[in-house]
Amino acid sequence: MDRCDVLVVGGGPAGSSCARRLVRAGLDVAVLDKARFPRDKVCAGWITPAVVRALDLDLAEYGRHLTLQPFTGFRTGPFGKELRLIDFGTPISYGIRRCEFDHYLLTRSGARVMAGQPLTDLRR
């Protein structure tokens, strides 16, 4: 039986971010997920600057090896009419691939990862 101070069930962005903070606080943390990472995740592939700040992401480091596409604006308009470009000049969001993003956050957490293992029993 594995022992730890904190068991985080789920290795997605919320679980891995929680694990990272707990590891930084000096706790022995394990993350358990029924999936193996990297995994395909059908989900929107965008993060905002607020997410970048909340997760303390180093965009230069992340973008060096993983998909990171800054979006500074968008086009909008009714069907069949001319589209209007709205450009904010600075990134309002970043395109990412969830399989890369989730794996990066989980690896970066510093927690012990038990992937491919569903939670079947829990004892205190």
Give the positions of each predicted feature.
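Fold-independent oxyanion-binding glycine-rich loops
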Residues: 11-12, 34-35, 79, 117
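Conserved N-terminal helical subregion
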Residues: 53, 60-61, 70, 75-124
